[in-house]
């Protein structure tokens, strides 16, 4: 499998190189040159497979030529063997034809475990084969950091440095990062805000000289391997609800468009998906595009669903590439204009093509709390705020009551106690058994000033274990 850039000017790469590259050299994002397509007979034969076996069948074409089948099977078995539920991603019925796909049974209780548990193991495998070692730098406001650290904690060839704003993440989120103790794990609390952390990561990627030749790798949602891993659970859910002989619809809480783009790819690979709903909060750049062909940058508004608090959606470029007939030059020109003006729209026929599959809804904090309370009263299920937004969008935007509607349950409610408390249900979520002692565990974290030079000196000093810098 070869991968090409959405902007058309970077060389095509194989899976190994894409895994390590993150962004393409022309600033674009990598996508498969040719998307595999499965027949209905193939998809039907996967009914009842354990999650890791289904994952092998769905993802095998993407790693072909880079990872041997036996190695990939072993990696997948290890990846999904650490999840706390036997089904890995169980379906929970809310009522009638309405379902929640629980994606929070991984080590850090968020959907990001599906991709980052795999990404860490893939990196370690590829680096061992190459005899290389890399440094991962990332910034987090909570969930991504803990999932990335948990995914890389046993990697022999990776040193990971995650920055979070000092005293600005919840105690649960902080402890999920700082209680993972390993020689290759480095938590840095920056005396600043999340944007300060993000800017330091960007500056480090732009000028990697401080690492003296060691490669810096990104694990955020632009990395193709994360999108690839998320395709699987769309097949997993749909197969339990009658696919491929029956269509299924999905409502997806999304800010960066990565999770829902995986559903779009699943459909293009042969899964009968009749509708994809973009469910978002008041930071609604995706809703404004889907509802009115206006992708305009706006002010950031903090919300009860912080994982969707974004101004620009980093994976939206991958959809634009397809809407423009995979014309990288057209996408590059469009995004250059967006960078200059903060505004983007596409030709009417391209937007109409997107609307054949996509619907969207922006949900306020008040509506989010209403939905948490309503679902709890009617079904006994306690939702996190992101999942509640997905359920609200599913109920308001679904096109057919006869088609199963699946909302992606993106996080465990224990991660967002403020939203649950504001919903007024009088029920506080409890930590799962494997995290019951979280508040007693030893923490390890380094507090650093908001100064790039001091952060880079720390990374240079502690990174690349076992090899001179």
From Swiss-Prot:
Q: Which cysteines are joined by disulfide bonds?
A: none
- Identify residues that carry N6-(pyridoxal phosphate)lysine: 112
Q: Which InterPro entries match?
A: Ser/Thr_deHydtase_PyrdxlP-BS, Thr_synth_N, Thr_synth_N_sf, Thr_synthase-like, Threonine_Synthase, TrpB-like_PALP, TrpB-like_PALP_sf
UniProt keyword Metal-binding, yes or no: no
Q: In which pathway does it act?
A: Amino-acid biosynthesis; L-threonine biosynthesis; L-threonine from L-aspartate: step 5/5
**Gene Ontology BP term (one):** threonine biosynthetic process
EC number(s) given by UniProt:
4.2.3.1
GO molecular function term, any single one:
threonine synthase activity
**Cofactor needs:** pyridoxal 5'-phosphate
> Which PROSITE patterns does this one have?
DEHYDRATASE_SER_THR
Its EC top class is lyase
Keywords from the UniProt entry: Amino-acid biosynthesis, Lyase, Pyridoxal phosphate, Threonine biosynthesis
Q: Which NCBIfam families match?
A: thrC
**Family note:** Belongs to the threonine synthase family.
Question: In UniProt terms, what function does this protein have?
Answer: Catalyzes the gamma-elimination of phosphate from L-phosphohomoserine and the beta-addition of water to produce L-threonine.
What is the official name of this protein in its record? Threonine synthase
Q: Which organism is it from?
A: Pseudomonas aeruginosa (strain ATCC 15692 / DSM 22644 / CIP 104116 / JCM 14847 / LMG 12228 / 1C / PRS 101 / PAO1)
Q: What is the lineage of its organism?
A: Bacteria, Pseudomonadati, Pseudomonadota, Gammaproteobacteria, Pseudomonadales
């Amino acid at each position: 499998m070869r991968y090409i850039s959405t902007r058309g000017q970077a060389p095509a790469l194989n899976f190994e190189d894409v895994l390590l590259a993150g962004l393409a050299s022309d600033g674009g994002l990598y996508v498969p040159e040719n998307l595999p397509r499965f027949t209905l007979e193939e998809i039907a034969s996967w009914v009842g497979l354990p999650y890791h076996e289904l994952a092998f069948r769905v993802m095998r074409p993407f790693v072909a030529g880079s990872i041997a089948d036996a190695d990939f099977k072993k990696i997948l078995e290890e990846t999904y063997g650490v999840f706390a539920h036997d089904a890995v991603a169980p379906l929970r019925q809310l009522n009638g034809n309405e379902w929640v796909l629980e994606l929070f049974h991984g080590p850090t209780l968020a959907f990001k475990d599906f991709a980052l548990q795999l990404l860490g193991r893939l990196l370690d495998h590829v680096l061992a084969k190459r005899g290389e070692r890399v440094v991962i730098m990332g910034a987090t406001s909570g969930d991504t950091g803990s999932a990335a650290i948990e995914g890389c904690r046993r990697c022999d060839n990776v040193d990971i440095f995650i920055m979070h704003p000092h005293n600005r993440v919840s105690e649960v989120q902080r402890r999920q990062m700082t209680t993972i103790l390993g020689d290759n794990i480095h938590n840095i609390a920056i005396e600043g805000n999340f944007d300060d952390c993000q800017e330091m990561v960007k500056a480090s990627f732009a000028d990697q000289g401080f690492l003296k030749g060691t490669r810096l790798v990104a694990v955020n949602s632009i990395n193709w391997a994360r999108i690839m891993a998320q395709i699987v659970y769309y097949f997993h859910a749909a197969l339990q609800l009658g696919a491929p002989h029956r269509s299924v619809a999905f409502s997806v809480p999304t800010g960066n468009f990565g999770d829902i783009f995986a559903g779009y790819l699943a459909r293009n690979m042969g899964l009968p998906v009749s509708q994809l709903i973009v469910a978002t909060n008041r930071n609604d750049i995706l809703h404004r595009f889907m509802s009115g062909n206006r992708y305009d940058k706006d002010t950031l508004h903090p919300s009860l669903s912080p994982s969707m608090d974004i101004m620009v959606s980093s994976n939206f470029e991958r959809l634009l590439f397809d809407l423009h007939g995979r014309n990288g030059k057209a996408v590059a020109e469009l995004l250059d204009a967006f960078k200059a003006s903060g505004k983007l729209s596409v030709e009417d026929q391209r937007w109409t093509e997107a609307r054949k599959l996509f619907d969207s809804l922006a949900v306020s904090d008040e509506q989010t709390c209403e939905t948490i309370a309503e679902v709890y009263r009617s079904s006994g299920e306690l939702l996190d705020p992101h999942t509640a937004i997905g359920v609200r969008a599913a109920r308001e935007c679904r096109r057919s009551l006869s088609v199963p509607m699946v909302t992606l349950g993106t996080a465990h409610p224990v991660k967002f106690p403020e939203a649950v408390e504001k919903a007024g249900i009088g029920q506080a979520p409890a930590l799962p058994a494997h995290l019951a002692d979280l508040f007693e565990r030893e923490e390890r974290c380094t507090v650093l000033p908001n100064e790039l030079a001091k952060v880079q000196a720390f990374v240079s000093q502690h990174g690349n274990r076992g090899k001179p810098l």
